[in-house]
């Protein structure tokens, strides 16, 4: 598997049963598209996100009826619940009382100091962290006047101002995000932030667009940020089904060796040498391994030129030949199979390797107990 990219060490912050920062893995987050007060729809969407591999989910809370739904939602899901709060500090207090795992606020729009202090006091009492969410599109007026337009320095200045509000109240369970729709601006802001404080960073490119273009833009931005060892949680923001956000995030993390429990598919580009329906087989195997939660690399190659030698790092793979397929493990051919059954044979081998790796994980856990 790819070597894990080094991530800048940050202060560990507990969110539910996860720890963000420190030397812990990068966590995938998404956000629901439902009205939060519609409990059935919201829970159903969160369960779909869980199945896709989402590890933390955020919900909007613009109204009191949304806050009143949080306790029931929390009781019916299996991952940490984060609540987005703007302007009304009483909604933050209700969310904390409901037992959510984190709140996302901008201390600058909550109101007077005593309102911020009330939120922080409640969060401290319940050991609930706060994410400070800075957005290039909504910087404070005095910062825009100072810099003329959104800049990385202005975004970090805003973050530091909000951090100080919380630190002055002796609150340190803080996570920070500095989002922009411009990739270069986001990259510069996160780089400067990583040099300015040690709180964990939630990274993403905001308002990145619909599925195809948004995925590409997010991959470019997140890839650049992660390659510098920056980022503790990620969200891919798409104008699409949030399940797609999770899928894209997983692929980005896998590209950097940062997905500890996911399967990776490699497949060759098509050319005139292929003897099998490569595109259909690759798509079928990609779907088959989508929910696997162990480290495994699978290869689907169109001919013997590209495989098995060029995919020797794969745990299991298949290379097409005329009327047959060559099954191989770590570059070594294990057997030939008829073309008609090679996909099913590959799936059987994948299943066997998954069982092996799951047994190894359990044995490792037992040895540490």
UniProtKB/Swiss-Prot annotation:
Keywords per UniProt: 4Fe-4S, Iron, Iron-sulfur, Isoprene biosynthesis, Metal-binding, Oxidoreductase
Cofactor note: Binds 1 [4Fe-4S] cluster.
Gene Ontology biological-process entries: isopentenyl diphosphate biosynthetic process, methylerythritol 4-phosphate pathway; terpenoid biosynthetic process
Disulfide bond annotation, renumbered to this chain: none
Listed InterPro entries: Dihydropteroate_synth-like_sf, IspG_bac, IspG_bac-typ, NO2/SO3_Rdtase_4Fe4S_sf
Names of required cofactors: [4Fe-4S] cluster
Residues that hold [4Fe-4S] cluster according to the record: 268, 271, 303, 310
Pathway it works in: Isoprenoid biosynthesis; isopentenyl diphosphate biosynthesis via DXP pathway; isopentenyl diphosphate from 1-deoxy-D-xylulose 5-phosphate: step 5/6
Any one GO molecular function term: 4-hydroxy-3-methylbut-2-en-1-yl diphosphate synthase activity (ferredoxin)
Name of a matching Pfam family: GcpE
Catalytic reactions of this protein: (2E)-4-hydroxy-3-methylbut-2-enyl diphosphate + oxidized [flavodoxin] + H2O + 2 H(+) = 2-C-methyl-D-erythritol 2,4-cyclic diphosphate + reduced [flavodoxin]
UniProt-listed PANTHER family: 4-HYDROXY-3-METHYLBUT-2-EN-1-YL DIPHOSPHATE SYNTHASE, 4-HYDROXY-3-METHYLBUT-2-EN-1-YL DIPHOSPHATE SYNTHASE (FERREDOXIN), CHLOROPLASTIC
Protein name: 4-hydroxy-3-methylbut-2-en-1-yl diphosphate synthase (flavodoxin)
């Amino acid at each position: 598997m790819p070597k894990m990219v080094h991530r800048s060490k940050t202060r560990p912050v507990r969110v539910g049963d996860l720890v963000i920062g420190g030397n812990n893995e990068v966590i995938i987050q998404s956000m629901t598209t439902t009205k939060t007060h519609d409990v059935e729809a919201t829970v159903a969407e969160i369960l779909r996100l869980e199945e896709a591999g989402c590890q933390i989910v955020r919900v909007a809370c613009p109204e009191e009826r949304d806050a009143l739904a949080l306790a029931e939602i929390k009781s019916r899901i299996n991952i940490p619940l984060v609540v987005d709060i703007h302007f009304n500090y009483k909604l933050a207090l209700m969310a904390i009382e409901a037992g959510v795992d984190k709140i996302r606020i901008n201390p600058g729009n909550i109101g007077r100091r005593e309102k911020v202090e009330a939120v922080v006091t409640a969060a401290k009492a319940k050991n609930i962290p706060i994410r400070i969410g800075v957005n290039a599109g909504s910087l404070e007026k005095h910062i825009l006047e100072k810099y003329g337009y959104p800049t990385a320095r202005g975004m970090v200045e805003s973050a530091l101002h909000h951090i100080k509000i919380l630190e002055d109240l002796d609150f340190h369970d803080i996570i920070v995000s500095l989002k922009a729709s411009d990739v270069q601006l986001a990259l510069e802001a996160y780089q400067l932030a990583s040099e300015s404080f040690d709180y964990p960073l939630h990274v993403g490119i905001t308002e990145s667009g619909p599925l195809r273009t948004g995925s590409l833009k997010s991959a470019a931005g997140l890839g650049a940020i992660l390659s510098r060892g920056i980022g503790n949680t990620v969200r891919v923001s798409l104008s699409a089904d949030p399940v797609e956000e999770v899928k894209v995030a997983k692929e980005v993390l896998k590209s950097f060796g940062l997905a500890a429990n996911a399967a990776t598919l490699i497949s060759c580009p098509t050319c005139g040498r292929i003897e099998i329906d490569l595109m259909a087989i690759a798509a079928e195997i990609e779907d088959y391994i989508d929910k696997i939660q162990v480290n495994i690399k699978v290869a689907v190659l169109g001919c013997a030129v590209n495989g098995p030698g060029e995919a020797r790092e794969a745990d299991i793979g298949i290379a097409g030949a005329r009327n047959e397929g060559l099954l191989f493990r770590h570059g070594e051919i294990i057997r030939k199979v008829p073309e008609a059954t090679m996909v099913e044979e590959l799936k059987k081998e994948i299943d066997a390797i998954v069982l092996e790796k799951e047994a190894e994980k359990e044995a490792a856990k037992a040895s540490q107990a």
